[in-house]
Amino acid sequence: GSTSKEIINEFSKVVSVLNHGYVIHNQAVSLMKSSHVLINFLFNQSGYSTMISGKLIEYMATGNPVLVIGDLNSEVSDLMKISPNSSICLSNDTKSIKDYILKMYNLWIEDKLESKLPVGIEKYTRKFTSKELCNILKAMPK
């Protein structure tokens, strides 16, 4: 995916931002794992439930803290509860966003920012969900 220049410019006002642009998947996973905090923006379409993206699952699977900007009443919000040091904030809640980033920054400065795999994240992997789908299809009457 891509990130708009406006978003990069806004974040650059308060934190150091390094935009790698489009990279191949293996490099993307490596960059995710090497990051201290990952930020995921949820597409918000009124009247529709926010879907849980593969990208968010990949972010969570790194064990690194994840800040999600999106709907607090979505399935994503429920999923975020299993991810230690992670948070979800509304896009207009700049105080909560700032507080979260500052908290993660202070943990990083104190060398206390830890990666912790969310308990149960493996059930959201492509491998696991594909296996579950196969089991459902096999159980269907022919």
Cite the ranges covered by each PLM segment:
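Short hydrophobic beta-strand element within catalytic cores of glycosyltransferases
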Residues: 37-40, 58-70
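Membrane-embedded alpha-helical bundles of multi-pass transporters/translocases
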Residues: 1-2, 23, 32, 40, ...
